[in-house]
Amino acid sequence: SFENGLEGWTRVEYANGSKTLLEVVDGEGVNDSKALKIQQLPENDKCCVGVKRTLTDLEPDQMYRMTARIRYSDIPNGQGTGPVIFRPNSKQYWNSSRYLYGTELKNWTNVTVDFMADDNGEAEIVAALGFWQGGMANGGRSTGTAYFDNISVVKVTDELFTLESEYMRIFIEPSKVNISVQVLQQWLKNLDKIYLSYLELMGEVPHEGRKLAIQTTKGIYSGYWALAGYPILWTANGTAVEDSFSQMLQHDDWCFGILHEIGHVFNIGDTSWNWNDEMFANFRMHYALEKNNGKVYMDGRNGKQVFTGGEILDMYKIDYENTIGTKVNDNGIHYMLARMAASITWEPYKKTFNYLRKNGGSGTNKYDKFVHFVNTLNRFAKETNPDVDVWDYFSALELESIKKQLN
């Protein structure tokens, strides 16, 4: 509560806070108690302003739930996040409570956000109008008025559905779990295989080698299915989780979306060479699926189908065929880069990623980075076969189409 004013809290201005009203007011809290009020008028533009405090004596690497009660008014629909609570974290930028829009002053809205404590048993928490990160599709920042009260934090590791394997941990909202523990255990074993293959390809592991974590959250922008980081966020809005679990049961699906996000997590080291990690997250997955005979249930040439192992190349070939004649898309570039593996093997790719991870890229635009990548791959391919030239795998039409996409 805020009965003692802002004792223990500190005002924080992430964006445009010079004209933001932030105060503790009487009679606006639960049962007419005191509440934190934050107000940003539309004429002063969108903001992210709130209060923060650092929690101590938490259990390291355990899941905690921050809860607050909020009333709000005049929050433009779809503008930023509205009033939210969150834990600012450089390893996972995007986690927050669910977004609130419009006006609801008569009743209190309960919101929650789950987060992991740091290794030192600390965590910074924030209650704010608007979100600390502006680089999201809705802009992050907001205007309007919000009242916060009854902020609390409790450990919830045991309240979530939790399961772990050698390299993975999942923290899932229990109502989302619609398949057996045995099926999920097998999935985590499959993710362990993927993890080791990503390590083979990239030459290093992320997050100091700790187990990667996946957690469900309602505080995720509606356009996002999941977001990479530590932990990986998986939307609890809608039925994304349940649908994925059902596909695991029906099709032995390893879950393309989660494999993609883990692929992002392995974008490590000097990443200046990387012109598009949406593509390279899938490229890492491609290698891992081929090496482990993994399965994903995705759109094929005649509707949904299971792609097993190296069959995944054909999924990317579909886009290649549909776009190569004009401006090839990223999936088409993926196809062209991956098709050579059947001839030159994956070893030059491993050496290429390991080299680039340590040394970075060359060139200021995307096409220059593409050229640097292929030249590096070519250099390592020649170590095995001096007669090979990977540029020979690209036609003039293909290179022209790639230029149109990357310039």
Predicted regions and their residues:
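Extracellular and organelle-lumenal recognition/adhesion modules and their flexible linkers in secreted
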Residues: 1-158
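Juxtacatalytic substrate-recognition/specificity segment
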Residues: 162-259
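Loop/turn elements at helix/coil->beta-strand transitions in domains of secreted/extracellular proteins
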Residues: 166-168, 204-213, 261-264, 289-294, ...
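Extracytoplasmic/secreted proteins, especially bacterial periplasmic and envelope-associated proteins
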Residues: 182, 186-193, 197, 253-257, ...
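Active-site-proximal alpha-helical
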Residues: 198, 307-402
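Surface-exposed patches in mature extracellular/periplasmic domains of secreted proteins
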Residues: 201-215, 269-274, 296-300, 349-355, ...
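Zinc-dependent metallopeptidase catalytic helix centered on the HExxH motif
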Residues: 242-308
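Non-catalytic terminal regions of proteins
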Residues: 405-407
